[in-house]
């Protein structure tokens, strides 16, 4: 069950993704990192068909790096979100990607404390949010996040909320898996230790 989950906390964005790659009813691997570090202050969470997911996220990552090399400054998170949305939307007519994305980033110039969180689906829709999730997890977690999430949560409280979310998923899903947790802030990207309930 593919799960992408991200929400804003004080000073940054917490991002969680499952680590499994499945094909039909077979689990191919359980140590896949679905949270791509685009640069020092941007994370791209992706879910979908394995080939589309890897190819599209690598294409996006390399083009954003090329932009920063050509212009001598990095692409802002809002600009990256619009670039990704445009690539998804234009590919629908030629080669549609079966992929859903969440982009999280930190920019000094952005309002709301510098943090940005964007939700994108395979049809190219784009929405700026305070929290978002993709996959079957969204059926269970959106209500829970609506009730418990606040943008001024401390990092520790945010991690506790992530534990609450993964506990809910363990309760609802037949199969539970491993997760990867990352945090993006003004200090850069950190991989945080995270033990989902067994």
Swiss-Prot record:
Protein name according to UniProt: Proteasome subunit beta type-2
PROSITE patterns, sorted: PROTEASOME_BETA_2 (PS51476)
Similarity comment: family membership: Belongs to the peptidase T1B family.
Subcellular location: Cytoplasm; Nucleus
Signal peptide annotation: none
Pfam families: Proteasome
Physiological role: Non-catalytic component of the proteasome, a multicatalytic proteinase complex which is characterized by its ability to cleave peptides with Arg, Phe, Tyr, Leu, and Glu adjacent to the leaving group at neutral or slightly basic pH. The proteasome has an ATP-dependent proteolytic activity.
Nucleus found in the keyword field: yes
Record GO cellular component, one term: cytosol
Gene Ontology BP, a term: proteasomal protein catabolic process
Domain of life: Eukaryota
Gene3D superfamilies: Glutamine Phosphoribosylpyrophosphate, subunit 1, domain 1 (3.60.20.10)
Name of the gene this protein is made from: psmB2
Species for this entry: Dictyostelium discoideum (Social amoeba)
Record key words, sorted: Cytoplasm, Nucleus, Proteasome
Keyword Phosphoprotein: no
